[in-house]
Amino acid sequence: MGGREGNPVFARQDTTIFTVMSSLATKHGAINLGQGYPDKDGPLAIREAAARALREGPNQYPPMTGIPELRTAIANHDAHFYRVEFDPKSEVVVTSGATEALADSFMALIGPGDEAVIIEPAYDSYRPMLEALGACVKSVRLEPPDFRLTEPMLAGAFSNKTKLIAVNSPLNPVGRVFDRNELELLAAFVSRYRAYAVCDDVYEHIVFDDYEHIALISLPNMRERCLRIGSAGKMFSLTGWKVGWVTGPEPLVRLVANAHQFNTFTTSPALQLGVAYALENEMNFTLSLTRELQAKRDFLIEALTRAGFGVFPCEGTYFLTADSSKLTEESDRIFCERLTREAGVAAIPFSPFYGQDGPSGLIRFAFCKGMDVLNEAANRLEKYFSPVAPR
């Protein structure tokens, strides 16, 4: 490469593990239980609303912070589910996906030398985004088997330089839903250190059994210290639309909007109208989807257990965490690559969800697929790990 080097944060990044494993799955004709996207699109009525808007127009730049219909629908959603009121004119920003919402929020709050806390295992975008902004990233490392937040963990990560903590609940990849005690502990540290919380709530409605997603922003004194991120793709099985949003107090959202205008500036008006329709008319789909996913979770837990994996509890998201230590001594990545090539089932190794020294033997399976797909994956795994199966 001629000339001077590029940004060292991105120069040292490999292709994301999700792209790598999906490409490997395609190459070997494997069932892809790695990347977390449904294999069936969301409701036709939502897609028709977007198609109608595309045909009828206008198809020019919409307002930078989002069309009024969608901003109002988002504010109504948060008021209904969390009893937190936001002004749609000044406290909502629509983004091109939740990952852009994360980037905008980090850009709005972080300056060079600030400290940012992430909870590991963590979505793999957090660390490089923050480091590219000049942040010093501290990690709170949750430990199996329960992956719970504790006061000593947070005390070891927070300092007087802490500017923000990224909070993902339900937590990808382990499926934890932080309970009220854990969230109150988080809130206490955020307040004590006068920090902010960027709440990655994209799996907010995918919560199982008797667990409840509690929005951190709804806790006492947290409204002024939180930015809350949502995702239409996760709610309505429309991940390719890449429509997300940020809600929060006006002073913080104004900074998010300033960052957003220099990133994507805006998002397709037709897709925004489709999502506005969905939030106002199709939330029953989202709630019924969660019931379907719970049945699929239970099916895959049984299938993985029969194949010889240890399986951790899953309280939310559409991912299962499996322990392969009784099946192999290989690294998680080598094992996942072999599983894809030889068993015909792709999964995601856990190590990319940690900055360094992730736990050995853990892998992530997505169960947001059709039952026929999950059944075939179960058959392949059971056959491959059968004691009489050839190796």
Residue ranges and their predicted role:
Residues A132-K138:
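A short helix-loop-beta submotif of the ANL/AMP-binding
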Residues D114, A135, R192-A195, R223-E224:
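A short helix->loop->beta-strand "cap" motif at the edges of active sites that frequently abuts
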Residues L293-Q294, A307-A343:
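Conserved PLP-binding catalytic core of the aspartate aminotransferase-like
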Residues A155, R338-A347, P352-R391:
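PLP-dependent enzyme catalytic core of the Aspartate aminotransferase-like
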Residues R4-G97, D104, M153, A278-N281, ...:
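N-terminal small-domain helix-loop-helix segment of the aminotransferase-like
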Residues L142-D209:
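Active-site phosphate-binding strand-loop segment of PLP-dependent enzymes
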Residues L219, R223-Q294, D298-A307, K383-A389:
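Conserved core segment of the aminotransferase class I/II
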Residues A108-L130:
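Conserved PLP-anchoring active-site segment centered on the Schiff-base-forming lysine
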